[in-house]
Amino acid sequence: MLVVVSDTHSSEDHRLRGRTLTAVREADTVVHVGDFYREAVLDAFEAEARTLRAVYGNNDDAAIRDRVPKARTVEYAGVRFAVTHRHRGGDTGLVMFGRERGADAVIYGHSHTPRFDGSTALPLINPGSHAQPRGNRPAHAEIEPAGAADAGGEGDAAGELIGRLVTPDSEVFEEFRLGR
């Protein structure tokens, strides 16, 4: 499973709890979309995740900016994700960012608003914030191969992924599909 979190905004720890903490510990890969805030928080995520792929956000200190890039590409189960904290130009700018990187979808943060939009030229995924939702639901995203839950983690070979926006209390409030 690929787990996506963003906008922790903490000085000391990862602020993970409930299903979000469990998902981070069980994930094959965790993508953090920036705004850890302080280096100790990045360290805390590295201690919990098997594999952490992160980008820095506009509120991250210099120590974080020295350790992780501003943008990156992550491949999972044959699907390529362009990852950034934020990008100028709204949805169009995010789609252009993804196309420049040959991505199948774009993962971004910054707004603290959990969102999936499949109506754009490339699907856009924002996990929201598990720790500082700012009037939204606290959330993270879980993405796995279609059929993985039914096939004991095997999934299918067609490159289709199923995603969910989930609260720390295990409420799945949006499901979506992605493909190559």
Where are these regions (language model features)?
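Extreme N-terminal starter segment of soluble prokaryotic enzymes
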Residues: 1-3
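Conserved catalytic scaffold of divalent metal-dependent phosphoesterases
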Residues: 5-14, 19, 23-32, 36-133
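Binuclear metal-dependent phosphoesterase catalytic core
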Residues: 101-102, 125-180
